């Protein structure tokens, strides 16, 4: 069959890898909601969901059925198009950001030379979902939550990007595969420890996770920018948040902890174990830390995180120049 060319085979393999990787990410994001509730129960010395299936193993299925059959209500005075578009953007933005993450040698959806810039672009796109949701709902609590979320996300994305510049300078590339290969001898978390700390803090803030979940504060804003959402639209916001956690955890592994590299076990297993560890850390942080005031969150970012990232970048540049002499 002459129509089967090497180019066609390469395209089909790329599509297959994209479908497999993105399905795994969505599945991990969905199952993390169940795992979080079970782990929170363990951390707080109480029972988690344990009634549906063996040990609560079918709780996720029950939640999905409930979500499918809930009324997909749209407020009467809302902007219907933007109201519907917002959860789609929230779901797809950080899911697309995972496309640049190499899970093992040769297994990456898009091996871009501007991989880190693509991630920052997708993280910035998620801000529009929040603004669209808050403004289109025609609800004052939604709008206040959206304004908080957009200001917080844009602020912490500054530190998110600056914290990665030390890694880029050491690897000499924005390509994620090149960054993983540059950690063959020493993981970046050792020379870039302060960069890792800042990236982890900013990653939690960008995902709007506790303790940086002021945009969704129940006591102040009645659940924030998605108060008017129900049914599958709310489900897209819900799963999108967990996909963001999976993506940020995978980026921590790729940029600072050697990616798929490790002894004895297959590369994908190492990548999965490292990523699962950081996903559990997100849950442990939620169970351990109180929620600060909104002004404290913004002050912490600009007065502590920003100077720390700038000092880390300057020291990294000085070390690289010294080694080049």
Curated annotation (Swiss-Prot):
Task: From the Swiss-Prot or TrEMBL record, state where the protein is found.
Answer: Cell inner membrane
Q: Reaction catalysed by this chain?
A: a quinone + NADH + 5 H(+)(in) = a quinol + NAD(+) + 4 H(+)(out)
Query: What residue ranges are annotated as transmembrane?
Result: 11-31, 81-101, 114-134, 154-174, 186-206, 237-257, 265-285, 304-324
Q: What is its EC number?
A: 7.1.1.-
One term of GO molecular function? quinone binding
Do you know which PROSITE patterns this protein is assigned to? COMPLEX1_ND1_1, COMPLEX1_ND1_2
The processes (GO biological process) annotated in the record are: aerobic respiration
- Looking at its record, which EC class is this enzyme? translocase
Keyword hit for NAD = yes
Keywords for the protein's UniProt record, in alphabetical order: Cell inner membrane, Cell membrane, Membrane, NAD, Quinone, Translocase, Transmembrane, Transmembrane helix, Ubiquinone
What kind of membrane protein is this, topologically? Multi-pass membrane protein
* Record-level GO cellular component terms: plasma membrane
Q: What is its main location?
A: membrane
The answer on whether this UniProt entry bears the keyword Membrane reads: yes
Entry function: NDH-1 shuttles electrons from NADH, via FMN and iron-sulfur (Fe-S) centers, to quinones in the respiratory chain. The immediate electron acceptor for the enzyme in this species is believed to be ubiquinone. Couples the redox reaction to proton translocation (for every two electrons transferred, four hydrogen ions are translocated across the cytoplasmic membrane), and thus conserves the redox energy in a proton gradient. This subunit may bind ubiquinone.
Concerning HAMAP family, the annotation shows: NDH1_NuoH
Q: Which family does it belong to?
A: Belongs to the complex I subunit 1 family.
What the entry lists under PANTHER family is as follows: NADH DEHYDROGENASE SUBUNIT 1 (PTHR11432), NADH-UBIQUINONE OXIDOREDUCTASE CHAIN 1 (PTHR11432:SF3)
* Assembly notes: NDH-1 is composed of 13 different subunits. Subunits NuoA, H, J, K, L, M, N constitute the membrane sector of the complex.
Q: What is this protein called?
A: NADH-quinone oxidoreductase subunit H
Q: Which organism is it from?
A: Escherichia coli O7:K1 (strain IAI39 / ExPEC)
